[in-house]
């Protein structure tokens, strides 16, 4: 039964076989890369691995964390005492910020670093860093200014009718 399924899988249009062939030929592709690209792929791999480990650590469901979270939710909000330090009041204000703001504060830099590492895997070294927001905005503005400059120069040309 397994052998029949495997033989049927050897068709050229099979996605599994295509993926396996690409994995087997990855050694050849790895040798064709330059040092910067190899380091870029290693950086992307390590970045994703560390991100997965941190995600697992932060969002791991554990009885201790659940108990502490339930105790925190069940506590009645208390008015700040006169003896409360500025760090406690700052912590209380920061924790009251909405989730979307916290997500944006962490995800935008996270994706910027990931996209920069991914851009290091490109063959053309001139394209490294184009995905970083300030660089991208500078390139777009520069292109717009050069387009306006070129269109002004074209409009100044005199047409010669022959």
Swiss-Prot record:
UniProt KW Lipid metabolism keyword: no
Keyword Transmembrane attached: yes
Cellular component GO terms held in the UniProt record: Golgi apparatus; Golgi membrane
Entry's localization field: Golgi apparatus membrane
Keywords of this entry: Golgi apparatus, Membrane, Transmembrane, Transmembrane helix
GO biological process, any: regulation of vesicle-mediated transport
Any one Pfam family match given in the protein's UniProt record, by short name: TMEM251
Main location: Golgi
Transmembrane portions of the chain: 39-59, 97-117
Membrane topology designation: Multi-pass membrane protein
InterPro entries linked: LYSET
Family: Belongs to the LYSET family.
Annotated function: Required for mannose-6-phosphate-dependent trafficking of lysosomal enzymes. LYSET bridges GlcNAc-1-phosphate transferase (GNPTAB), to the membrane-bound transcription factor site-1 protease (MBTPS1), thus allowing proteolytic activation of the GNPTAB. GNPTAB is involved in the regulation of M6P-dependent Golgi-to-lysosome trafficking of lysosomal enzymes. LYSET is thus an essential factor for maturation and delivery of lysosomal hydrolases.
Protein's name in the database: Lysosomal enzyme trafficking factor
Species of the source: Xenopus tropicalis
